[in-house]
Every structure is written in C-alpha cells, then in structure tokens.
A protein has these predicted regions:
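Periplasmic c-type cytochrome electron-transfer domains
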Residues: 1-356
C-alpha cells in the first residue's frame, strides 16, 4: 500500500529475461546499481534495497548476491500455455482474436517519439503496436515501453503470457470509464484479484469496454457486434505465445495392451510431428523445433534412452545405436518393455535421453 502506487498485484517471477525494466511502473530500471531502461539483469539487481526495506534484512543485498540471484531467477521460464492446442494451432475464436490483434484496424494509442526523431511518429496502433508479440526478440506482449493510461501514474506495457492464471475473480461493479454492466455478486471466488495492475477487472472482455477501446468508425473494437470481437481477443490472449511450445512436457507411454495402444498411437504421431516443426524462441537460441522428443524403455532387462533425430527421422540411443519409429514402437509389444515418450524443452533431449 505504497502512498504513490496504491495496491498492485504481484507479477510472476518467471520469464523475465527479455522483458526489460521490471515492476508495473518499470521503475526498477533506475536504482541501486545503475540506470538502464532495457536491461533486465540490472533491473532485477536494483531490487536489492527491498531486502532491507521490505523483508527486514539489516542491509540491502550485495551486488554479488543480487547477481547470483539474477543469474538463477532469469533462467526460470513460464510453463507452456495450457490453453493453446498441443499442435500450436488456434481455435476459430482465437484465430479471429489473433486477426484483430495484428490487424490493420487501430485499437488505441499514440506513440510519442524520441525528441528529434519525429519520423517514428505513429498516431494510432493495433493491439500489437503496444503489446508487441515478437518471438525472435523474446517479446510476448510487452514492447518494453511505458504508456499513459489516464490513471494516477505511468505504467510499463506488461506482457500477456499468463492471462489464464488471472481467471477466478468473478463479477464487478459498473465504472464510469467503461460500458461493462454491474454484474452483481457472482458467488464464491477462486481468486481475490483479477486483471490489470490493481486486479480490479474480472474479465478481459470487460476490460475491453473501457473508453480507449470504444468502437468508432475507424478505431477501437468494431461497431458491429463489438462484444464478439472482445471475446475473441480475450480468447487469443489467454492462449498467448510463449518461449516454450504447448507440446513441451507432454508424455505418453506405449504398452502391449491393445486399448492403450489405440489411444497412445496418435499421440506419439503428434509428438514426432511437433519435434520436426520449426519454432522460434530467443530464449532457446532462435530457430529450433517445438520440442526435443525422447523415449525411454527397458530392453532385455536393460534401461535404454533415445532422442529423436528430426533430420534423420530416427531415434538415436544414448549408446549411438539407431532405431526407426516402427522398431521402437515394436519394443512395447513385449510386456515389461513399455516405451515412454516425452517432449522435452529444445536443447535438452540428448541429456534427458542419456541413461546413467
């Protein structure tokens, strides 16, 4: 309850490596160890005084201590989006939201250019103009810039990768700057806070009724059926892209049981397909595939591990031996030789496949 900030929701500590300045206001870009608007490591280290002022330490954390903490914390990433389809496709509603988000219709905003750089003046934006999605730059909703929203302070444009985690605060009162109706009491709640910096909004579709998004002839949500587009954009934002593809972490075991094989077979096909599919992630080094597929089994009493070589279309054992897809699946025909397939983060397949 800072006298200037007021109450604000706690932001996730995951996935911060490429998002620039931290805090809702981006204010940690200027602090204890220096000033830089785009340096996530420095911004993280500038939290050092909080260990004294908020947590009761006798003094701020040392720079060495904060550097070690930053080295660890900035490697922690957001999990794959649990709403996005496992083949990374969009539903019809999500695709409509995607098309509006990246479309030509301005939704809100005037870009204030740097002094002396008027060539970059843009009078209006689509959603992506402020909430930039660019996997090659590691941006998933934040362009690292600040915005003036007509509230008591200037805030940084936040990322949008964890909107699904904010669902659960149901209902809200009507407010003067939006057209969403007063919902009345909605019963038991899952979360105490919802969307935006202070957690006061229950649904993204309700947030999209604020004045800056109001439908006009050439800006805001469409004049015809705006609520449908609001819901579509909400659906897309709940399925937002991230550094890890949706298939990462998926696992299936193939056994000799006929019914189980019938269910597992198409899932294995999917995992192999996604392990071949190109994917872009700055965090993972740029151009990769959606996952590294590994398989583990017990063959003739010995534990075996394999990683999928997408170029050769074969499974490579930790001992260097190779198996075709069909040959590996056939091992599971024998009870006790079940084969477990796992889509692991790109770059980790060989390590995870290795049997110690």
């Amino acid at each position: 309850f800072h006298p200037m900030k007021g109450p604000m929701t706690t932001q996730t500590l995951k996935g911060m490596a490429n998002s620039g300045a931290m805090h809702w206001r981006g204010d940690r870009s200027n602090g204890f160890f220096g000033v830089h608007a785009d340096d996530a490591v420095l911004s993280f280290k500038n939290f050092a005084p909080a260990f004294e002022g908020l947590l009761g330490n006798p003094e701020p954390m040392s720079e060495g201590g904060m550097q070690a903490f930053a080295d660890f914390m900035l490697q922690v990433q957001l999990q794959p989006n649990p709403i996005r389809n496992l083949d990374n496709s969009l539903t019809a509603a999500q695709k409509r939201g995607f098309d509006f988000y990246f479309g030509e219709r301005p939704s809100d905003g005037i870009l204030v250019p740097e002094i002396g750089n008027l060539r970059n003046f843009v009078k209006s934006h689509n959603c992506n103009g402020c909430h930039t999605v660019d996997a090659a730059q590691g941006l998933y909703g934040t362009g690292k810039m600040q915005s003036f929203e007509g509230i008591s302070q200037i805030v940084k444009v936040p990322h949008l990768r964890n909107m699904y985690a904010k669902v659960g605060r149901f209902g809200g009162a009507a407010v003067p700057f939006a057209t969403a109706p007063d919902t009345g009491h909605q019963g038991d709640q899952v979360r105490g806070f919802g969307f935006v910096h202070d957690g006061t909004v229950d649904l993204l579709a309700h947030f999209f009724t604020v004045r800056v998004f109001q439908p006009t002839l050439n800006s805001g949500f469409p004049l015809i059926n705006p609520n449908q587009t609001r819901r579509d954009v909400s659906d897309f934002m709940h399925a937002m892209d991230s550094d890890l593809a949706p298939v990462v972490g998926q696992q299936v075991t193939l056994s000799a049981d006929a019914g189980q094989r019938l269910a597992a077979w198409p899932r294995i096909d999917l995992l192999i397909q996604r392990a071949k599919t190109p994917f872009v992630s700055k965090l993972l080094g740029g151009q990769v595939t959606e996952c590294d597929l590994v398989a583990h089994t017990v063959e003739n009493g010995l534990r075996r591990g394999f990683w999928f070589d997408a170029v050769a279309n074969a499974f490579v054992g930790s001992d260097g031996s190779r198996r075709t897809d069909a040959a590996l699946r056939s091992l599971a025909n024998v009870a006790g030789q079940e084969v477990t397939y796992t889509c692991t983060p790109p770059g980790s397949g060989r390590r995870i496949a290795a049997v110690q």
